[in-house]
A protein has these predicted regions:
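N-terminal beta-strand motif that seeds the catalytic metal site of vicinal oxygen chelate
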Residues: 1-20, 47, 59-61, 107-130, ...
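Vicinal oxygen chelate
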Residues: 2, 5-14, 53-123, 141-145, 187-230, ...
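Fold-core signature of tandem repeat domains
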Residues: 9-11, 22, 27-29, 41, ...
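Conserved active-site tyrosine of GNAT-family acetyltransferases
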Residues: 19, 23, 75, 103, ...
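Residues at alpha-helix termini
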Residues: 27, 78, 134-136, 193
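Conserved short beta-strand elements that form part of the metal-binding/catalytic scaffold
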Residues: 27-59, 105-110, 139-173, 220-226
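Structured core of small recognition/catalytic domains
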Residues: 126, 132, 139-209, 215-220
Length: 230
């Protein structure tokens, strides 16, 4: 389906001013209002990578595809359910929303800038792996370095490095991931700024450290740090 990777995210907040202050303090993110109640999000000195929407809709991890309508039909044939048909966002991108076979909400977009990682939590890893492999032509491999947990990495066709992963037995969710220099520092500052620590930090056998947090509005993230020289 010519899917590249996760290329956008969308978070929501009933108190967007508080949300913007949280991310500005945590990561220095910049918010540009595209229309009332909708802001694009960019890291310091970088292009837009996501959006903040006023409201209480579920956050979205958004996959960049070459053809939104065609991908939507393909996912429906695999058991996905359409939540929102293709329409233009205030940022101008064509976007649709589906639920995967575990009822995780995903976005499909016509454009975007790849984010560092994404993670799919599932209590049925077999069905989840099959869905995403058939949906986007990815392969999944067991991460043997992830000691004590069942974790799989996704690879896109022709890719040398994984683009995301499946965490088995961790409940059902679909969240974007952020590359950070110090996971414990991010989790600590998140808590002091009104967010919550969901898990971690934990490290695998290769020295990769991960953690999860939610912002004050409940938007959930994975964060990870690679070992020095990694």
């Amino acid at each position: 389906m010519n899917t590249r990777t996760v290329g956008w995210f969308e978070i929501t907040a009933t108190d967007p001013d508080r949300c913007r202050k949280f991310y500005d303090g945590l990561f220095g993110w910049e918010f540009t209002e595209a229309e009332a109640g909708y802001w694009t999000v960019a890291g310091p000195g970088s292009s837009s990578m996501g959006a903040l929407r006023s409201g209480d809709r579920d956050e979205l991890t958004i996959f960049v595809v070459c053809e939104v309508a065609g991908t939507l039909s393909h996912l429906e044939s695999l058991g996905a359910r359409v939540i929102a048909s293709p329409s233009r966002t205030p940022a101008g991108d064509l976007q649709a929303v589906v639920e995967d076979v575990r009822s995780n909400r995903l976005g499909l977009s016509s454009s975007g800038t790849p984010v560092a990682w994404f993670e799919i939590g599932t209590d049925d890893p077999g069905a989840t792996r099959k869905f995403y492999e058939n949906a986007f032509g990815w392969t999944s491999e067991r991460d043997e370095a992830a000691e004590g947990v069942e974790y799989y990495s996704f690879l896109a066709p022709g890719a040398e490095q994984p683009i995301g992963g499946i965490f088995a037995g961790a409940g059902d969710y679909a969240i974007p991931g952020l590359l950070v220099s110090d996971v414990e520092d991010v989790l600590d500052r998140c808590e002091r700024s009104g967010g919550s620590r969901v898990m971690g930090p934990v490290s695998d056998g290769n020295g990769l450290t991960i953690g999860q947090f939610t912002d004050p509005s409940g938007n959930r993230w994975s964060s990870f740090a690679v070992p020095s020289g990694g």
